[in-house]
Amino acid sequence: MNKNLLIVYALCGILISTGIAYFFVAYGEYTDWMELLNFGIHDETTEKQVEITLFVTSGLIYFGLALWLIKTRFMKKSPYIAAMIVSLALIITYIASRTVGVPIVGVELYVGKLDVISKILQSVVIALSFAGLYKIQQSVRALRV
């Protein structure tokens, strides 16, 4: 198999896996929210709704990035750049949520398995996107020669 295709297939797989991880996180937040409501705790409703929305949206974005990459036949730079920007933005948001806090949610103290898994997957997305961009640049140079 061509190394270029191996990189993009791996990237698509990681993008889809990251999307699935975010759906699991959203489901976990939803079950936590339902549990709080069952105990009569309504103070965290807005926080949970924002978190669930963020995680579902993030999962959908990762699925969309994988489809965009496939649709452009892996030769456009923009999906790779978008994947890096989205992943980096979510990593920065995560770090901020654990240190200085983010609006509505505040400072989160819990670091779960899915948190770590999603950050590892996002780091791999960034690395594979860089590799994909490098391969595109090499292909362009080869065509010019």
Where is each model-derived feature located?
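Membrane-interface extramembranous regions
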Residues: 1-145
